[in-house]
């Protein structure tokens, strides 16, 4: 239930700060958001899949921690990211 390589490459290319940037908070949050959105569609059909739901909650928690880190480091980048991602924070 992960993203395919083309989708990941497109997300990395869109949010990267420089050419080979895969570890910046923006890229990590964008990848986690795509995975979270993918899993939400999965739960529409599989309501009792508690094992995957736990993984979803871990991803949401990790994304929240990355967003809190970015908010403390650089508020402008944080606000730009939540606007581009459509997150309601």
Curated annotation (Swiss-Prot):
Keywords on record: Ribonucleoprotein, Ribosomal protein, RNA-binding, rRNA-binding
GO biological process, one term: translation
InterPro entries registered for this protein in UniProt: Ribosomal_uS15, Ribosomal_uS15_bac-type, uS15_NS1_RNA-bd_sf
SUPFAM superfamilies per the UniProt record, alphabetical: S15/NS1 RNA-binding domain
This protein's GO CC annotations: cytosolic small ribosomal subunit
HAMAP family associated with the record: Ribosomal_uS15_B
Subunit composition and interactions: Part of the 30S ribosomal subunit. Forms a bridge to the 50S subunit in the 70S ribosome, contacting the 23S rRNA.
Similarity annotation: Belongs to the universal ribosomal protein uS15 family.
Protein name: Small ribosomal subunit protein uS15
């Amino acid at each position: 239930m992960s993203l395919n390589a083309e989708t990941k490459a497109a997300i990395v290319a869109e949010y990267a700060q420089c050419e080979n940037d895969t570890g910046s908070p923006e890229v990590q949050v964008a990848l986690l958001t795509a995975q979270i959105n993918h899993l939400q569609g999965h739960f529409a059909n599989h309501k009792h899949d508690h094992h995957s739901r736990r993984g979803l909650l871990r991803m949401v928690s990790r994304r929240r921690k990355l967003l809190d880190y970015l908010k403390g480091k650089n508020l402008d980048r944080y606000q730009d990211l939540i606007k581009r991602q459509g997150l309601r924070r």
